[in-house]
Design a protein with these regions (language model features):
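Hydrophobic alpha-helical scaffolding
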Residues: 68-71, 91, 95, 117-118, ...
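Short hydrophobic/charged patches on amphipathic alpha-helices used for structural packing
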Residues: 9, 13, 67, 150-154, ...
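Structural core segment of the AMP-binding/adenylate-forming
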Residues: 1-63, 168-169, 174
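Conserved acidic residues
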Residues: 9, 18, 110, 163, ...
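Conserved AMP-binding/adenylation subdomain of ANL enzymes
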Residues: 99-111, 121-164, 173-183
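Conserved pre-ATP/AMP-binding loop-to-beta segment of ANL
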Residues: 52-80, 86-87, 92, 97, ...
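Conserved G/P- and acidic residue-centered "switch" motifs that form tight phosphate/ATP-binding loops
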Residues: 84, 135, 201
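Adenylate-forming
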Residues: 22-32, 162-208
Length: 208
């Protein structure tokens, strides 16, 4: 938790963020952890956290407005590097970057299935923003759902006639584990609609 707070604090101060979008469930957990942290800091010093306005997106659904529809800005978002060897660096991703890459990557209107987290670049860009640009669709679910029931991934691909899906290497290995994915759950699967399946985001093992 402390490591996560340190990353949030660094990014907020580096880019000057004022607002954080989240969900009610996450915000409750975050506030509880902060309360525990304040109690523990009575006996030990703790670094101050930056002030943010937290907006729960659950509460603003259905309240769409046209106020920003005609406002454009070349910067779409800042994508921070992992920071494994130094402080994370905010890389500017422009509207033009996204549109160009989407059209260079996809040759059809995609039907995507993904359990990748939305905060990960492969999940965010490849399975939420690319379909948006190309007029496609995405059927997404939580990585936790995949870990609990990996058959859900393959069954969803089969049911919605998905054309694109991706996973880190461990996801494919996970599906090869008969204890996690019994052969009985593979019956009736039809993955012939897939045009693109990518293994990326971590070292690819040839034996997989």
């Amino acid at each position: 938790f402390e490591g996560g707070l340190a990353k949030i604090t660094f990014v907020v101060r580096d880019c000057g963020a004022k607002i954080a979008l989240t969900t009610r469930g996450f915000l409750r957990s975050y506030q509880l952890l902060l309360a525990k942290r304040r109690i523990s800091s009575l006996w030990q010093s703790a670094p101050a956290l930056p002030k943010l306005e937290w907006v729960t997106t659950d509460d603003v659904r259905g309240q769409a407005t046209n106020a920003f529809r005609n406002r454009t800005h070349p910067t779409l978002f800042l994508q921070y590097t992992s920071g494994s060897t130094s402080d994370p660096k905010g890389v500017i991703v422009t509207q033009e970057n996204l549109v160009h890459n989407a059209h260079a990557t996809l040759t059809h209107i995609p039907v995507c299935v993904s359990w990748l987290p939305q905060y990960h670049d492969m999940g965010l860009i490849g399975y939420y923003l690319f379909p948006l640009v190309m007029g496609g669709s995405v059927h997404g679910f939580s990585p936790l759902n995949f870990l609990k029931r990996p058959a859900l991934w393959l069954q969803t691909i089969s049911n919605v006639r998905s054309t694109i899906t991706s996973s880190p290497n461990f996801g494919f290995e996970y599906c090869l584990n008969e204890e996690k994915l019994p052969e009985s759950e593979l019956e009736g699967l039809d993955l012939s609609s897939l045009q693109f399946m990518m293994n990326a985001a971590e070292p690819v093992r040839a034996e997989t």
